[in-house]
Structures are given as C-alpha cells and as structure tokens.
C-alpha cells in the first residue's frame, strides 16, 4: 500500500509539470512569422508619394552590388561593389571594388564635382588624378533623377504587398533598361526591359532598395542581378574635390 501510495503521489505531482511543458513546447512549435499583408493604399498612390519625395531629395548615400556579373565602367575595368554619395544636382563620390581584364583586383573611385573629374589611382594609395571630362564614366549618373524616372515608367506591376516587419512596400514589375542604365554608366539595351523590385519605406516613401534582375547592358549575362540600397536621405553632405 505504501509503495502504491508513493507512486500515486509522484504521478499526481508530475502531471501538472508535464502538462505545462507540453503547452510550452506546443506554443513554441506553432509560432509563425508575421505575414506579408495587403496594403491599405493603392500602388499608384505609393508611387506618386515616392516620386514627389525623390524630386525633393537633396542628398543620398547608396551601395551597389552584383550577383552573377559586374559592370564595365571603363575599358578593362569592371565594377563589382561600390558605395557612394550624391549631392543634387552635380556632385558624386563613389568608391568601388573591381577587377581588371587580367583578373587583377583593384580598389578605385571617382569624385565628380560639376565639370571636374577625379579618379582614385588604383595602384597608389590615396592618390587622386584629374581626368579630362570626356573620361567620366558616370557622366549621366544622377541616382535621384534616375529613380524618379523609374517610378514614373514602371510597367507590368505583377505583385504588390506590405511587410510589417520591415515597414516597407514591395513592388515588382518591369522597367525599360534606358531608365536604369545611367545609374551604372551604361547605355541601355535598345527597346528592352528588365525585371525590377522596389522596396519603399512606408513612413516617408523613400526608395530603400532597387533590385534589377536581368541584363541592362550589352555585355550582361542573362542571370545578372544588380542591387542598389539607398540611405541617409537629405542629411548634411559635402563632396569636395581632392
């Protein structure tokens, strides 16, 4: 009798603990991520707001990266990753990692202020050289104006949603290559489009990220992906000549 009584007491004490553990495990097992939801605003309204914001932008910082490819910015110089700053309307600073046609890694950059073009010598640390204006690979680079044109000329919007975790609107569509090629110092493929994804801040309607999936220049592979991340909108920024 004493043994049975002891066993009964143990079982009686164990059951609540086991129940709590089971509930805890069950709750953790069924935790699901916050779903991407339908926005409470139309994609046209979002793009209109974003276009207005971009037109009023004075300064911005950006990062460029590539998957499955690169951008040839000058003969034999291929940009893979870059970070830069832009002051509207005519000052750009960009530092990039890249390769030469022989596979040699280089780190270089450009500073363009009005009509003056300086290139960071890839073989001499911190040495900038003045170039003739016609050697400026980013002569038409204006990320603010280019993104404004992208917003205006977005086509075939296939998907549109809101991610509450990142507080961003996600827009998926197509864009003619001639509207995005100038960001990379390229001439767009004639009468061709590429897939584009936009991530737009839901509070201020800034463009946070642009992904271009597919070729925009005549030397691009079919599976190339370019990504541009924008940040630090309208913060004080001064680009000076070296």
Per-segment meaning from a language model:
Residues 65-71, 99-103, 115, 122-125, ...:
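Hydrophobic lipid-interacting interfaces of membrane-associated proteins
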Residues 167-242:
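Gly/Pro-enriched, hydrophobic low-complexity segments
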Residues 1-21:
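Sec-dependent bacterial lipoprotein signal peptides
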Residues 120-189:
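Flexible, processing/modification-adjacent segments and terminal tails
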Residues 74-81, 103-108, 190-195, 222-226:
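Short, surface-exposed coil-to-beta transition loops
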Residues 81-144:
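An acidic-aromatic
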Residues 18-91, 158-161, 235-242:
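N-terminal leader/targeting segments and the immediate start of mature chains
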Residues 45-52, 81-88, 109-117, 195-202, ...:
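Extended lipid/amphipathic-ligand handling interfaces
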